[in-house]
Amino acid sequence: MNLVMFGPPGSGKGTQSSRICSYVSASVVDCGKLLRVAALTMRQSEDLKAGKLLPDELVIGVVREKLRELIKVGDNFILDGFPRSVVQCHALFEMSSELEFEISCLVKFEVSEREIFARLLDRLVCSACGALHDVVLGRCVSCGSVECERRSDDLKVEIIKKRLMLYGAVERDIVNLFRSRSIKVLSIDAGRSVDEVAADLRTQLLMFI
């Protein structure tokens, strides 16, 4: 099963991806993390920190190589943070033909803007493994490290607004493109607790297996 996790920043895509991979036997492809460790220019790094979208060709290239690696060894994948533009969406469909894989489902996370602001202004990123978690935890739930800090693109309200605006500008077009390919779009109420969302998602996804 190959999944695409789609939703605004702070909607819980990464958190749910890490849970899903255990029962659908798939590797999580965190596009944001891939780009943060890629050999970016100084300008590109600053744009990423400012919440701006990087050039489509750069993002597509990074994702294509990662998917190529996974497909080569027979792994399924969960895409988190890609596609984020119509161009990237078309590129993903081209990759599916080129690398011979099928996209099982687009999981669309729906959550209010108010909740998104609350989450993004109250989360940390682990300096050791890159996992995201709530600030109240104080310790990384993935590796146990206490070396955590706020992600640079979560620091300012203006940056969060920009990220939400970028998502809103392409949300409908991307969803419609998946539907035009007869790919199921699964809408999830992501405004609930992590466990509630996980349970609902598990129930619905297991219907595919």
Curated annotation (Swiss-Prot):
Pathway membership, UniProt: Purine metabolism; AMP biosynthesis via salvage pathway; AMP from ADP: step 1/1
UniProt: AMP binding residues: 36, 52-54, 81-84, 88, 151, 163
Gene Ontology annotations of biological process type: AMP salvage
EC numbers, comma separated: 2.7.4.3
Binding sites annotated in the UniProt record for Zn(2+): 126, 129, 140, 143
Coiled coil: none
Xref: Pfam families: ADK
Cellular compartments annotated: Cytoplasm
Family matches, as InterPro entries: Adenylat/UMP-CMP_kin, Adenylat_kinase_CS, P-loop_NTPase
Catalytic activity: AMP + ATP = 2 ADP
Binding site for ATP: 10-15, 123, 192
Residues covered by region (NMP): 30-54
Keywords noted in UniProt: ATP-binding, Cytoplasm, Kinase, Metal-binding, Nucleotide biosynthesis, Nucleotide-binding, Transferase, Zinc
Domain of life, source organism: Bacteria
HAMAP family reported in the protein's UniProt record: Adenylate_kinase_Adk (MF_00235)
Notes on the domains: Consists of three domains, a large central CORE domain and two small peripheral domains, NMPbind and LID, which undergo movements during catalysis. The LID domain closes over the site of phosphoryl transfer upon ATP binding. Assembling and dissambling the active center during each catalytic cycle provides an effective means to prevent ATP hydrolysis. Some bacteria have evolved a zinc-coordinating structure that stabilizes the LID domain.
Similarity comment: family membership: Belongs to the adenylate kinase family.
Its job: Catalyzes the reversible transfer of the terminal phosphate group between ATP and AMP. Plays an important role in cellular energy homeostasis and in adenine nucleotide metabolism.
The protein's name: Adenylate kinase
